[in-house]
Swiss-Prot record:
Pathway given in the UniProt record: Aromatic compound metabolism; 3,4-dihydroxybenzoate biosynthesis; 3,4-dihydroxybenzoate from 3-dehydroquinate: step 2/2
Catalysed transformations (reactions): 3-dehydroshikimate = 3,4-dihydroxybenzoate + H2O
Protein name (Swiss-Prot/TrEMBL): 3-dehydroshikimate dehydratase
Keyword NAD: no
Protein EC: 4.2.1.118
Taxonomic lineage from the root: Eukaryota, Fungi, Dikarya, Ascomycota, Pezizomycotina
Activity regulation (record text): Divalent cations such as Mg(2+), but also MO(2+), Mn(2+), Ba(2+), and Co(2+) activate the enzyme, whereas monovalent cations as K(+), Na(+), and NH4(+) decrease its activity slightly.
Amino acid sequence: MPSKLAISSMSLGRCFAGHSLDSKLDAAQRYGYLGIELFYEDLVDVAEHLSNERPSPEGPFVEAQIAAARHILQMCQARGLEVVCLQPFMHYDGLNDRAEHERRLEKLALWIELAHELHTDIIQIPANFLPANQVSDNLDLIVSDLCKVADIGAQALPPIRFAYESLCWSTRVDLWERCWDIVQRVDRPNFGICLDTFNILGRIYADPTSPSGRTPNAKEAVRKSIANLVSRVDVSKVFYVQVVDAERLSKPLLPGHPYYNPEQPARMSWSRNCRLFYGETEYGAYLPVKEVARALFHGIGFEGWVSLELFNRRMSEEGPEVPEELAMRGAISWAKLVQDLRIPVEGPLVTMPRVSASL
């Protein structure tokens, strides 16, 4: 099966900056994307506009969200786009507060209904990144929590799959190896992994607090990680992959840096501001994404959805040119990746020159 290009809906502009889902889907269609990861933020934004209702602190406005999901499906179908997944089902795994665990588990029923309305069978779960005092280090508890969602999803009609992803700043699961170990221990056919070049390399290769931008022994860490990935990962459990790069900062992300936020890990601040598309060296891209991508596409033989999950400060800027620019940059990076690695793909490739734009 050839690989298919997708992008996260918020990667084409944040709704709080005035970027409607309509405008972002239009841009995705124009530049040859075949699917989107629907960011929950965008679904809520559509629901608010359709119903003139806002979510209360006590809980979601359920009927408005279901109506929004139906509307979004129609929007996507009109543009020939599929919904790859609904994401992120956040801060669920390993909560110390078990009452909060139950409240979040109750929300899963709505997410499953939304997924059904969107005609997707995947809900993505990022590994918990709440403060350490809120997240257990008991791996058995984390596995048990994730078994629960997998079993609930398996009983849904149609069944729902879950893609678990380690983030490079997650509290307990910040390495793909640990994420993969958990997936194996959950041991459910509908529970798999999402492998993301940024989050893999952002943990073992990059260190935004270092003047070099790199961890000690970064190259050797990548070599070992790739060898482990190729030898250990069962590609049938990789539900989709994400391929992006990131910017090397001109100075360490420490107090006084424009992106420094004392309330979040440095890697999270870096991620939210500085991800780039593959090959964007003109913007400072420096991660060895090509090597990891080669392991994904040729080492384990991944085929299927490839999403460009960008987070970048450009997404929060206003102006109708933002979705257009980001969609074009992503499509050009995809064409470069396909050419560099000779990846069989479905759909056309963009060949126009890069757009000149500020970050």
